[in-house]
A protein has these predicted regions:
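Alpha-helical scaffold segments in carbohydrate-active enzymes
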Residues: 12-19, 146-149, 287-297, 360, ...
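Conserved, charged catalytic cores of large soluble enzymes
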Residues: 1-114, 156, 160, 292-337, ...
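Short helix-to-loop capping/linker segments positioned immediately adjacent to catalytic or ligand/cofactor-binding
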Residues: 94-96, 336-351
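Structured secondary-structure scaffolds
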Residues: 11, 32, 57-302, 354
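Short, charged/polar, low-complexity loop and linker segments
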Residues: 268-273, 331-340
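Secondary-structure capping and boundary motifs in well-ordered enzyme cores
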Residues: 8-12, 135-140, 176-179, 246-250, ...
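Basic, alpha-helical terminal appendages of large translation-related enzymes
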Residues: 30-35, 56, 339, 345, ...
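Short, mixed-charge aromatic SLiMs
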Residues: 42-46, 208-215, 281-285, 312-328, ...
Length: 439
């Protein structure tokens, strides 16, 4: 969510939120002292500061800090600590992986240590901020200002027109793990003070590393998405056999796919262009693309048609022991995918399940060799099951790779308005799903 902090609506909402907190005695005027980082625009407590050859630095960012004493408005965070501890343990934060469990424990510990934070700064040092109503010597502290963007952009206000909550609260709030303190402590405390609903779930994600280091403008190791998309587009080895290919759409699908495969929702992960190319060539070109090409070939499906069998019907023809697990995994794929994607919020695990079925389908085809069966019932059943697997794969991957998924379904004679029928009628163009990326 992006918002310009100087727009009139946001300024008016900030003032109204501040007045509401004043009336409920959640703000007070007080002296404040602490370690301040100009680079981070944040105060740090003693336990958050370390010494270095450069002097005092933030343990979190490594940026220099200096001691500051000033008078400001402060927020009574201490009044909400008991409620916040209960809320944090209510399941709002994930607790399945060791990384997430560690973040939850750290958030509880941080909450215990935090003092009442400042919500304003002297305008002599921060003249560019939104002024505090009635106090020309104070400006709204940037962290309070930034968090309020969620409410103003979501249509929440405390103006004379009333309190509209059209887009509040969010079902899921994705935040970087380094700003979890703001979003899992300060932000819900403010919402409690304003008597507004809290986010239903907060998902802290890891960082995308470059060369093992978090991306930073100061380090000069930032990867621009536009540059990566350009590199991927230029690496596509498109030939006439691929037909009309939208290189930009293919590159976008590949980048999204690789980012989700990087598991960055659970932990830090290193991203590189060679990794992306290897992932695409292995999983989308070799595993998925080659499966589509051979199962729709005229050697295996000479009439370019096949019956749409359900798995119970297919089992009448196919009884190899390995088929039972494959049929079970295939029938459960939509449910497993949805569980990981929507309920457990682990999209990388969703894609794991899809690629597992792709590999199983390749093994299933190799095991039954429909090209050598002479077009009998067994061969037709193999083709029908493999095509059904491809259909489910295309549907599951559509949120992640919409262009390639649509291309795959078109090859099966399907489209968004028709995802199932009585029989398969394949696309006769036989275009490969995706061009290989030049490494």
């Amino acid at each position: 969510m992006f918002g310009a902090v100087r727009i009139s609506l946001h300024v008016q909402c900030i003032w109204s939120f501040k007045r509401t907190l004043d009336k409920s005695d959640h703000l007070y005027w007080s002296a404040y002292s602490g370690w301040y980082s100009t680079t981070d625009e944040a105060f740090y407590s003693d336990w958050e500061v370390d010494t270095s050859p450069l002097g005092a630095v933030s343990k979190t960012s490594g940026n220099q800090v200096h001691w500051v004493e000033e008078e400001t408005f402060r927020f009574r965070l201490s009044a909400f600590k008991p409620k916040l501890h209960v809320w944090l343990d209510s399941g709002v934060l994930p607790n399945e992986s060791p990384e997430h469990a560690g973040l939850l424990a750290l958030t509880h510990k941080t909450l215990d240590r935090l003092e009442d934070p400042c919500v304003s700064r002297p305008s002599s040092r921060v003249p560019w901020g939104i002024p505090v109503p009635g106090r020309i010597d104070q400006t709204i502290y940037v962290w309070f200002d930034a968090l309020m963007n969620y409410l103003t952009a979501g249509g929440v206000s405390f103006t004379a027109d009333g309190n509209s909550q059209a887009l509040w609260p969010p079902d899921i709030h994705f935040v970087g793990k380094d700003i979890l303190c703001f979003h899992a402590i300060l932000w819900p405390a403010i919402l409690m003070a304003l008597d507004l609903p809290l986010p239903k779930k907060i998902i802290p994600h890891g960082h995308i590393l470059v060369g093992g280091t978090k991306m930073s403008k100061s380090l000069g190791n930032v990867l621009s998405p536009a540059d990566v998309l350009g590199d991927l587009s230029r690496a596509l080895s498109v030939s006439p056999v691929h037909g009309e290919v939208d290189a930009e759409s293919v590159a976008s699908d590949c980048l999204r796919y690789c980012l989700v495969r990087s598991v960055c929702l659970n932990e830090d992960t290193t991203f590189s262009l060679p990794f992306a190319k290897e992932t695409v060539n292995t999983e989308l070109v070799n595993w998925l693309g080659n499966l589509l090409s051979r199962i729709t070939s005229k050697k295996i499906a000479p009439n370019q048609t096949a019956p749409m069998l359900d798995l119970a019907e297919a089992q009448q023809f196919l009884s190899a022991p390995a088929d039972a697990k494959f049929f079970n995994d295939l029938s459960q794929l939509p449910f497993v995918f949805d569980d990981f994607w929507w309920d457990r919020l682990l999209p990388n695990r969703s894609v794991d399940a899809v690629m597992h079925v792709v590999r199983q389908t390749n093994a299933f085809v190799d095991r039954h060799k429909p090209w050598a069966a002479g077009g009998d019932g067994d061969a037709q059943a193999v083709v029908g099951v493999a095509l059904e697997a491809l259909r489910l794969v295309g549907c599951c991957l559509s949120p992640l790779t919409p262009y390639l998924s649509n291309r795959l379904l078109n090859c099966l004679g399907l489209h968004p308005g028709k995802l199932r029928g009585h029989s398969w009628r394949l696309d006769l163009t036989h275009q490969p799903l995706i061009p290989r990326l030049n490494v």
